[in-house]
């Protein structure tokens, strides 16, 4: 296997680790889990997580890529880039702007010689409905863009849609958007397998069916989701603010994990 001496991650809440367990007030996340495992396999391993929740692809390009470029060490660096999902979720999303931005960012990062790691997004989060169809339409186009540019530059692409279980409620946080601790663990193991590192071979073993929710329980969950996530999300959109405003990256410089 290729032994990476450095892992740099760029992006939004997915890579920051929102929804995972918190340690000292910070979410752990799949990226930190991967970094800890890689550190056990490589002396003097360092990790740099620049991801911040709520960031749009243009913000990741402007704020995070210049910082990451300072620390890339060619093929010995594993470089994760996942941005654009927040753009896709916005009412005014314009794929003619966002998708080319994404491609150019990937080309710039690939030119450093680092091993790129890209991600697709879950395309189906519900069985049916107008919102599901809009979600599927937008994210399937976004994902095709990720796959195409990933193939062009020789990136490793972690395709969420090859793991249908990841969209089940057992792996999603109560906001239905972020992963829970089990979900972050699952993504970490899938990434470790993709990059040729030691991984848990049982991470994608068949799972028993989830118990059916009763009608009252389903209504309670729906009301809780609307009041704790949907209404605040709409409020932020109306006020033009982001969940990432005023936040800083977990690691402003590489940290040694071994």
Where are these regions (language model features)?
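Serine-esterase "nucleophile elbow" of acetyl-processing enzymes
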Residues: 1-53, 65-75
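Charged helix-capping and loop-helix junction motifs
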Residues: 95-103, 135-142
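Residue-level recognition of beta-strand->loop/alpha-helix junctions
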Residues: 49-51, 120-121, 159-162
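Conserved, well-ordered alpha-helix/loop/beta-strand core segments that scaffold catalytic motifs
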Residues: 80-82, 109-110, 116-117
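Substrate-gating cap/lid alpha-helix
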Residues: 126-160, 181
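Conserved catalytic region of serine esterases and O-acyltransferases that act on ester linkages
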Residues: 152, 175-178, 182-258
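A short helix->loop->beta-strand "cap" motif at the edges of active sites that frequently abuts
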Residues: 43, 111-115, 155
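Oxyanion-hole/transition-state-stabilizing segment in secreted/luminal serine hydrolases
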Residues: 16-20, 58-99, 123-124
């Amino acid at each position: 296997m290729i032994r990476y001496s450095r892992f740099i991650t760029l992006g939004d809440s997915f890579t920051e680790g929102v929804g995972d367990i918190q340690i000292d007030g910070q979410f752990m996340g799949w990226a930190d889990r991967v970094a800890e495992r890689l550190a056990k396999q490589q002396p003097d391993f360092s990790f740099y997580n620049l991801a911040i929740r709520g960031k749009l692809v243009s913000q990741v390009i402007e704020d995070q890529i210049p910082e990451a470029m300072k620390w890339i060490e060619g093929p010995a660096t594993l470089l994760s880039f996942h941005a654009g999902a927040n753009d896709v979720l916005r009412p005014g999303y314009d794929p003619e702007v966002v998708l080319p931005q994404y491609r150019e960012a990937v080309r710039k990062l690939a030119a450093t010689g680092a091993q790129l790691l890209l991600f697709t997004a879950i395309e189906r989060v519900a069985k049916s409905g107008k919102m599901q169809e809009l979600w599927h339409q937008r994210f399937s186009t976004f994902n095709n863009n990720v796959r195409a540019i990933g193939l062009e530059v020789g990136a490793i692409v972690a395709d969420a849609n090859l793991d249908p279980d990841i969209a089940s409620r057992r792996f999603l946080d109560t906001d239905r958007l972020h992963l829970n601790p089990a979900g972050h663990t699952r993504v970490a193991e899938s990434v470790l397998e993709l990059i040729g590192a030691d991984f848990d071979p049982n991470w994608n073993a068949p799972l028993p069916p989830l118990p059916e929710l009763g009608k009252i329980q389903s209504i309670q969950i729906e009301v809780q989701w609307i009041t704790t996530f949907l209404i605040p999300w709409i409020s932020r959109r109306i006020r033009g603010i982001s969940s990432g405003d005023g936040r800083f990256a977990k690691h402003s410089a590489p940290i040694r994990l071994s």
